[in-house]
Design a protein with these regions (language model features):
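Sec-dependent N-terminal signal peptides
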Residues: 4-14
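Short glycine/proline- and aromatic-enriched beta-strand/turn motifs that initiate or cap beta-hairpins
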Residues: 19-61, 208-212
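Residues that define the transmembrane beta-barrel architecture of outer-membrane proteins
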Residues: 20, 48-52, 89-97, 120, ...
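Repeated loop/turn-to-beta-strand initiation elements of outer-membrane beta-barrel proteins
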Residues: 22, 64-68, 107-110, 168, ...
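Gram-negative (and chloroplast) outer-membrane scaffold detector with strong preference
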Residues: 28, 59-142, 201-212
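Outer-membrane beta-barrel translocator domains and adjoining extracellular loop/strand segments
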Residues: 34-41, 80-86, 134-144, 189-195
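Outer-membrane beta-barrel domain signature
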Residues: 41-45, 86-88, 113, 149-154, ...
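Predominantly the C-terminal beta-signal and adjacent terminal strand-loop region
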Residues: 76-81, 157-212
Length: 212
């Protein structure tokens, strides 16, 4: 995990030379496993859980109202479960590439809403993430199993998302912000009768650097 985070920070430094804005996001995923067995039945004993979220990348302006953010993500999609006899937990890490279109409802330093030098901005977002498990464990009553070769977890996932973020300019070239996205992560490679998708609510804290 430390090596992965170091790599994400390295990508952040590299994007300074290429993008109009570069950003770092950290947050929390609140995930529900959408699992069906070979009979098409869901497992009611699987409960939602939370995990960390990291993203680095850069954003480009397409026109005054529309922008594109391209980033690398590391997301944990976790769950717990069990009954009177057994206890389960799933802890996973997925590495992905993400593109998000951002529609600016209003931007900082604009005159909208009568504020001549507003420090606040709001954007509505729609995007797609393509990701793959890099490590994961399932624990059953103290026994640990590797999920990276499990048919339901391995392979590529496609994750469409919708959300919004707000930002506040704190000094000339630096802004901070908060974001929320809802997404569903669909498994693309699983050919078995058992299917697993992830429903995810994500909260993010964003640090944005404007490039000259």
């Amino acid at each position: 995990m430390k090596h992965i985070l170091t790599g994400l920070l390295f990508i952040l430094v590299c994007t300074v030379s290429f993008g109009q804005e570069t950003y770092l996001s950290v947050g929390r995923n609140f995930t529900t496993y959408d699992f069906t067995n070979s009979s098409g039945e869901s497992n009611l004993n699987v409960q939602n859980s939370s995990g960390a979220s990291y993203e680095v990348g850069y954003a480009m302006k397409i026109n005054p109202k529309l922008g594109l953010a391209i980033g690398v993500t590391l997301n944990q999609y976790n769950a717990t479960g069990g009954d009177f006899v057994n206890n389960y937990s799933w802890d996973t890490n997925y590495l992905g590439a993400q593109g998000v279109l951002k529609f600016n409802v209003f931007k900082e330093n604009s005159s909208r809403w009568g504020y001549n030098n507003s420090k606040f901005g709001l954007s509505l977002n729609a995007g797609l993430n393509v990701n793959h498990i890099i490590n994961g464990q399932q624990k059953i009553n103290g026994q640990t199993y590797d999920l990276t070769e499990n048919d339901e977890f391995k392979g590529f996932y496609a994750q469409p998302m919708l959300g919004f973020d707000i930002r506040c300019q704190i000094i000339n070239d630096i802004a901070v912000g908060l974001g929320y996205h809802y997404s569903k992560n669909f498994g693309l490679s699983n050919t078995t009768d058992q299917k697993l998708n992830f429903n995810n609510n994500q909260l993010q804290f964003n640090l944005i650097i404007t490039l000259n």
